[in-house]
Amino acid sequence: EGAKDVAVYRDLDVIKEAFTGKKVAAMAEALFEQGKTTLAETLIRKVKIAGIAAPSGSGETEKASALVQAVETLRETDDDWYILLTDQDGDEAVKALCAWAEATEPTEAELGAGEEDHRKLYFGRTQNKSLAVTNRRSIVIYGDQDEEYPDAAYVGNVGPFYPESVTWKFKRPQGLTVPDLTNAERDALEEANVNFLTVEYKREYVKNGVCADGEFIDVQMGADYIAKNMRENLYDIFLENPTIGYTDAGFALVAAGVFSALNRATDLGIIALDPESEQG
């Protein structure tokens, strides 16, 4: 909806003024205004927003590729973020962003070649009941109301728990309308690992809290957090010690960084406790 330099915003009114009449302002409102139904003890009050020119191309596939390239261009100057939301929800855009998100996690070979790990997680909305994507690191939620943004509302409602492990199913994002779906359509969305707001026994909640590949959202986010925390611990050890020898003491020092990350993950519920040993 127009090029604009990336900036950090902490105030919804400032966002509305900077992006008057644009989808991003409505998405920010859905993200911020979750205080009535969230189970978290806090709310999201800090976001990074960047504006890009409308993707160009002769068809939706080319435009989707241009969108991904624009995101990659932004990453060249600012890669210090984790979750991506966009105002584009066309089929080709969602498919391209799902594929992009999966590719942001470097392979062991790429890490060995010196590539940094700045893996991302994509949350997107679709209005297509038959959308089929199976990418890792991507969460798609169905919504049939043009003026509602279930992807932003979902992140705003459950995201504040991060990095604590939390079930993304059975959550009730504020400001969403339950989509008009038949039983067969709900079953199809479940089989496709597309999340959606539903009503069962007169209770509204999101089913099923999964990524497009079927992995639970909290499992994916937990794995990412462990990798991030472990890497930071190891870099701190390397930077704070003039020499780390190939000795028992050196190995123990490095191992301490690894176990510190795992213990932290256990405290956050990412790694389960053994009921007998009470260890992660």
Labelled PLM ranges:
Residues 1-280:
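Surface-exposed assembly/interface segments
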